[in-house]
Amino acid sequence: MAALAAGLSKQRAAAEGLGSNQNAVKYLGQDFETLRKQCLNSGVLFKDPEFPACPSALGYRDLGPGSPQTQGIVWKRPTELCPNPQFIVGGATRTDIRQGDLGDCWLLAAIASLTLSEKLLYRVVPRDQSFQKNYAGIFHFQFWQYGEWVEVVIDDRLPTKNGQLLFLHSEEGNEFWSALLEKAYAKLNGSYEALTGGSTIEGFEDFTGGISEFYDLRKPPGNLYNIIRKALCAGSLLGCSIDVSSAAEAEATTRQKLVKGHAYSVTGVEEVDFHGRPEKLIRLRNPWGEVEWSGAWSDNAPEWNSIDPQKKEELDKRAEDGEFWMSFLDFLKQFSRLEICNLSLDSLSTEEVHKWNLVLFNGRWTRGSTAGGCQNYPGRVHRGSG
């Protein structure tokens, strides 16, 4: 009876707008505006009691209390790391994201794709934040969780070693939006270590509330290039990776400098005239910001000398650090899976516009019966009754 009443209460609140991006649910009951006002009035910087700067926030095993990896970690605010910290410098871009000592490349790939759309980015990363005006050591971010937007509040104490950020950081040493976003997502998931080894599509969904689909690149549909092109034009988020057969292969580098088990963002496609025939190209980004494809159509590859110089210059300008072009055929040979998070309810697989109908059911997983697994293992086993 209590569960029914709670469900009805939630439905009523949703009908009144609670859980929308404009009126997000307050995670753990923490209200950003109220807490910031209290800190400004008292003159004391915010310290988050729900996600304190202590070993438990780092992790539970490899980053757990007493782990050798956590020795020497000091939590510092950006104001202690540089003289003029900024939330965002010159607009958030995909080059703002550099991976640190945490295996969350999947999350970085999702964040990099998020920066391709300012509208999407500022839905997750509210603009009203600064280290100057109304600074109180408190920041907030929004994530999509179980059918509603949730606002997560954090303080700005970040884990460092030797005066440098330990995890996600920006190329600009005084820019902190990406490091703070990672901390908010870690809080939502329980710890930083909980972010290790996820799936890019999980990040896409949590940042957008979009509908995701998966393509096995060993058996791609014939129109996949057009699907990707249309998805990018529609503002969808795309990621890809190379499957590994064992843990020993994880993050091993191929002869042509691709990293196995590593998440890449898909950031563009282009068709060029190459020796009198059309050549389909695709642009990818490694969240590490380095270690790029060294095969055909890579930086300084001879293929670039056989296309129109103006086109070459145009494509050069579009590629940022850590980004590279490769032929679409090589992409299909080298990569194992493609994940697309659709923000529009239009179908991507045809030129015609089809609308989806969305029906939302709230329920729960039951351990040993209906509980699902990590999205890294999407296989389903139907368990019969009786």
How would you label these PLM feature ranges?
Residues 1-386:
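Structured alpha-helical subdomains that flank or immediately precede key functional sites
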